[in-house]
Design a protein with these regions (language model features):
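Core nucleotide-handling region used for phosphoryl-transfer chemistry
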Residues: 1-355
Length: 355
């Protein structure tokens, strides 16, 4: 039976920061089956590949040996009779090309199409689909940007997660099936310990695409672009994706855009916080809060009290250091609190023998 296999919503940068932190902080489940997180674990540095985000409509083509080939929009299975901007009709009239692509995926990634569904995702873009962008001037075409493999479980309890595979080799330009990776790409390494330090570079690349769409230019049309989709694929086929869009293409609706940050100030804050919160100060305030020297125990419900003690001691003893750095207490309080929380959890874990 044909099923709609949805393409996930592309997140904002802030959501990806939260997702990466949650995954890398996860250490297991407790006796009640609830997740346990360790916020002190170092965050990863991940390389993200950026491709041009086209302003069209989401388009998927699925295949397995049992149900054959079918087309889908973001929300529904579609047919030439109930279409989405002509994309289902395009599949119907280019079946041979899509079946060849499905065969290439199955061969390259060793996919059994009797027990798995392959879905090719792309943007259906061109004349009559969207307006005010360079790509709106070309004849309609599909631009592939991803391939997902969905296993078929024999029983519901045997269900295994879908996963993503490389799609960079897929294209059939003579059939107007292109690959977004054949156009200019962008790369950035994001340190998730300090993700905001990547923000300005992301904005810079996005503005370049917004000012002149590289894909539209490749087809001979000048005009604005929508933005960039950044993605990182893990070894187990999970993909982190986030979008960065400009405002020029959307005159009516409000677009969520990244705001520039002061890299020098952020680095200054990090350096100053490290200077004013040495381990000995945190240890002193931990003892003051919990009376550890006399047998007191660390309690999570009093973590806020510990943080306040550290903040107050820093303001009392390090005001000159903060002022010399050209900062105010409000500039560093959030980072001081973060440093305190990390230290607190390290000491709590040591107390119960986890480290």
């Amino acid at each position: 039976m044909k099923k709609h296999i949805s393409f996930p919503s592309i997140e904002q940068f802030k959501n990806i920061i939260a997702n990466v932190n949650r995954k890398h902080n996860f250490i297991g489940l407790d006796e009640n089956g609830d997740a346990i997180y360790d916020p002190t674990k170092p965050k990863p540095k991940l390389k993200f590949k950026g491709t041009v985000k086209l302003h069209g409509t989401n388009f998927g083509v699925s295949y397995n040996a049992i149900d054959g080939l079918w087309a889908q929009s973001r929300e529904n299975i579609i047919t030439p009779e109930k279409d989405n901007s002509g994309s289902a009709f395009f599949v119907e009239t280019h079946k041979t090309a899509f079946l060849i692509l499905m065969g290439q995926i199955a061969d390259t990634h060793k996919i059994d199409v009797k027990t798995n569904t392959i879905t090719i995702y792309g943007e259906w873009a061109g004349k009559g689909i969207q307006k005010s962008v360079a790509i709106a001037n070309i004849d309609k075409a599909m631009f592939i940007f991803g391939v997902k493999i969905t296993p078929h479980p024999k029983h519901e309890e045997d269900k295994t997660p879908a996963y993503w595979v490389d799609s960079s080799f897929l294209r059939s330009p003579e059939d107007r099936i292109f690959n977004i990776e054949d156009y200019p790409q962008y790369e950035i390494e994001i340190d998730f310990n300090y993700p905001q330090l990547s923000q300005n570079k992301i904005i810079e690349m996005t503005i370049a695409v917004e000012d002149e769409c590289p894909v539209g230019k490749a087809f001979g049309f000048e005009g604005i672009g929508e933005g960039i989709v950044f993605s990182h694929m893990t070894e187990d086929g999970e993909v982190y994706r986030f979008k960065s869009k400009g405002e020029k293409h959307s005159k009516a609706s409000k677009v969520s855009t990244l705001k520039p940050v002061d890299d020098a100030k952020i680095n200054n804050i990090i350096e100053t916080v490290n200077k004013v919160t040495p381990d000995w100060r945190l240890e002193q305030m931990l003892d003051k809060t919990f009376d550890i020297m006399n047998g007191g125990k660390i309690e999570i419900k009093r973590m806020g009290e510990f943080i306040r003690n550290v903040v107050n001691d820093v303001l009392k003893e390090e005001s000159d250091t903060i002022a010399t750095a050209g900062l105010e207490p409000k500039d560093i309080n959030a980072k001081v609190s973060e440093r305190c929380r990390n230290y607190f959890f390290v000491k709590q874990n040591e107390e119960v023998g986890l480290k």
